[in-house]
């Protein structure tokens, strides 16, 4: 088999077409003479120039054109020039449309945008883990939003849930023995979300927690004095920061997260109006 000249054509980046082409060529034990990629092809002028070049060099065209009008024009032009052409997407899109009775979106680059969203989500999850429970106060400056609250207000699971939405979240525990990070006062208060809970619910949760680890009644963790002290510190800090505060009492993680997302959406809308 002689080394082929392959021209990859796409109305997006062309990465998919090139990857498939290289995979196919590997089955023949061949490295192509070259694979030349033409990306973001969306006009008759571009199509004619490309096909003419391929014809002169006795090459073949492999394409993943999504836009139907561009795809049809490329196929017809290649046939007119006698250029071999492989349409990777057309037959598949047509079959899927017939099978599922829905029209394709015809939006180039959707796989790439979905990949970017996936990697952003992974990065957000890693960020949440690295900045969990106040372990890295400097992360506050890089966070999209910061959750503050006393122990047992679901800061960690909420951080992970919001990270799945692609948000970079830091959570900071508010305890009497720990100094409040200076970074909290360096960011926009709109990026801070306080999580409060009723004294009765918190007492019950902490008592159940002590029982679950075999230490019922141990220490001051679930004592009225300790809980009153922590709640007072939180309320004072939230007031000083002038941040949004959400009551998580008797709420599931998903419910609280959705309320946070609604609040975040309101902030975005407000900024767009400015």
Swiss-Prot record:
Keywords: Kinase, Nucleotide-binding, Serine/threonine-protein kinase, Transferase. It is an enzyme of class 2 (transferase). Bifunctional serine/threonine kinase and phosphorylase involved in the regulation of the pyruvate, phosphate dikinase (PPDK) by catalyzing its phosphorylation/dephosphorylation. The keyword Transferase applies. ADP binds at residues 149-156. Its EC number is 2.7.11.32, 2.7.4.27. This is Putative pyruvate, phosphate dikinase regulatory protein 1. It catalyses: N(tele)-phospho-L-histidyl/L-threonyl-[pyruvate, phosphate dikinase] + ADP = N(tele)-phospho-L-histidyl/O-phospho-L-threonyl-[pyruvate, phosphate dikinase] + AMP + H(+); N(tele)-phospho-L-histidyl/O-phospho-L-threonyl-[pyruvate, phosphate dikinase] + phosphate + H(+) = N(tele)-phospho-L-histidyl/L-threonyl-[pyruvate, phosphate dikinase] + diphosphate. InterPro entries: Kinase-pyrophosphorylase, PPDK_reg. Belongs to the pyruvate, phosphate/water dikinase regulatory protein family. PDRP subfamily. Pfam families: Kinase-PPPase (PF03618). The keyword Nucleotide-binding applies. GO terms for molecular function: ADP binding; ATP binding; phosphotransferase activity, phosphate group as acceptor; protein serine/threonine kinase activity.
């Amino acid at each position: 088999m002689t080394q082929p000249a392959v021209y990859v054509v796409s109305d997006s980046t062309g990465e998919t077409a090139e990857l498939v082409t290289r995979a196919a060529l590997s089955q023949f034990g061949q490295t192509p003479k070259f694979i030349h990629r033409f990306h973001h092809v969306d006009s008759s002028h571009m199509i004619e120039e490309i096909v003419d070049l391929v014809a002169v060099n006795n090459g073949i065209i492999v394409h993943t054109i999504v836009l139907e009008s561009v795809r049809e024009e490329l196929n017809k032009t290649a046939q007119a020039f006698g250029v071999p052409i492989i349409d990777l997407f057309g037959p598949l899109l047509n079959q899927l449309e017939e099978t599922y009775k829905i029209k394709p979106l015809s939006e180039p680059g959707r796989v790439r945008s979905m990949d970017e969203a996936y990697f952003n989500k992974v990065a957000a999850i890693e960020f949440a883990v690295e900045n969990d429970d106040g372990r890295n106060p400097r992360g506050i400056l890089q966070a999209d939003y910061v959750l503050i609250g006393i122990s047992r207000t679901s800061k960690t699971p909420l951080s992970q849930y919001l990270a799945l939405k692609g948000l970079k979240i830091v959570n900071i525990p508010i305890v009497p023995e720990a100094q409040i990070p200076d970074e909290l006062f360096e960011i926009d208060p709109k990026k801070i979300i306080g999580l409060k809970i009723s004294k009765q619910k918190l007492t019950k949760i902490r008592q159940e927690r002590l029982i679950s680890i075999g230490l019922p009644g141990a220490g001051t963790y679930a004592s009225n004095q300790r809980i009153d002290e922590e709640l007072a510190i939180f309320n004072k800090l939230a007031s000083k920061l002038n941040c949004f505060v959400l009551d998580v009492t008797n709420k599931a993680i998903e419910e609280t997260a959705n309320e946070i997302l609604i609040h975040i959406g309101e902030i975005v809308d407000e900024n767009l109006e400015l």
